Structures are given as structure tokens and as C-alpha cells.
Amino acid sequence: MIELFGIKNCNTVKKTLDWLVLNNIDINFIDVKKDLTSEHLNQWFQNLPSDLNPLMFVNQRGITWRNLADSNKQLINSTKGIIELILQKPSVMKRPVLVNNKKVVLLGYDEEKYQKEFA
């Protein structure tokens, strides 16, 4: 079963949930504000697909990022810092994160990639 990590009221997460339901994909939703752990992030970052890196998990265009103190923004200079930042401010994480067998398969909403992954 696919795990979808996100925030319920995020429009991108809602769009992803709608697409997955429409395409009969079973998912388990995990709210990153309540249930995201350092174990999740460490496991993901150790097994990322070649087209992803830890920095891509930080949404540097969002309001949460823009409102961060410069000292917090400096955390993105290391994987350990990225994990710390996401755990402190889960809303800074790019969403959704789709995980299969404890490995990230997709980050963000991309219908074309969803069709390839779940065809």
C-alpha cells in the first residue's frame, strides 16, 4: 500500500488524494504535522531515487520558508539540518511525499509521473 505524507488542507495533497482515489490506488494518509518522525526522514534520505535529493524536500517558495529566520534557513546546508528543519516546521516540506515499501517514489504532484508509476 502506498503511504501519502502530507497535510490534509494542502491543495496539492487534496489534488493528489483525488487522483489516487479516482484511479483506485489504495493509500494510507500520514499527517506530517502529527505523525512524521526523524526515522521516516532518515529512511527516505538514505534510499532516495537518483532524481531526488534531500534539499528537494524543502519548499523554498512557500510562505513557511519565507517567514523563517535566517538561522533556520541555514539548516538546509546539511541533510541533518534539513531533517531538523522539517521536524520543527513540517509545513516547509514539499508535499505530497508518496512512499512505497519505505522508499520515496514520488515528491509533489505530477500527474504524468503518477500515471507512469501506477499504470
Question: What role is predicted for each listed range?
Answer:
Residues 8-16, 54, 114-119:
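Unusually extended, aromatic-enriched hydrophobic runs near protein termini
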